[in-house]
Amino acid sequence: MPPHQANPLADWQSGYGPIVHRAETIERMQALVQRLVTQMRVADVATAHALLSAADRVSCTAMSVVAHMTYARRIDRSGNPLEPEDFKRTPEGHTGGSLNMVPAFVGYLLANALTGTTRGWVMGQGHCVAAIEAVNALIGDVSATQRGRYDRSEAGLSRLIGDFYSYAIDEQGRPAVPLGSHAGPNTAGAISEGGYLGLAELQYVHTPLPGESLVTFLSDGAFEEQRGSDWAPR
């Protein structure tokens, strides 16, 4: 067993990288873990804590990938400094929002894994797609058009990073890479892009059918820049 898995509870409680768990978070998660074990939805306490620790590590790595997607042309998984030519001349991407979305989306995946229930998801911030794509590449949940191009290897992540906001066009005048600036048809799990901040999320109350579950990442985009006739407090 790897050293960081010798004591799953202590491993998770200690956090990882910039991720720190408050006493309140630890208390609530302990109660949740005990309830899930009692309900036989997760095998045992150690398994649950191992999943929690894994979520921290995926989140930390995905946030690094998101930052690289905005500023860099490639990633060095060994941690060596990048050269000046490895940085994009014109950085683009909604980095702040995407960094916030990473732990939210990983938390959604963690909830699915802990409970054995796959939920749908709606993200009000379609422009934060870097978070979704980074996490998907790391865990191997990419779309058919992305399979074989993006993965968690250094080469696969570097292709993801280099393709982001590349505006590459093929000979037919179509996008040459399966990656956009917003959630789109090539984003695994995405089925709709509202085209207006918060438009799709306004329907979240009515979206799931009876017996279905939905996780919604609400956006305050209306306060950010757009207040249209459909504006509503979130």
Give residue ranges: language-model regions.
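Cofactor-binding active-site loop characterized by glycine-rich and histidine/acidic residues
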Residues: 58-81, 92, 97-234
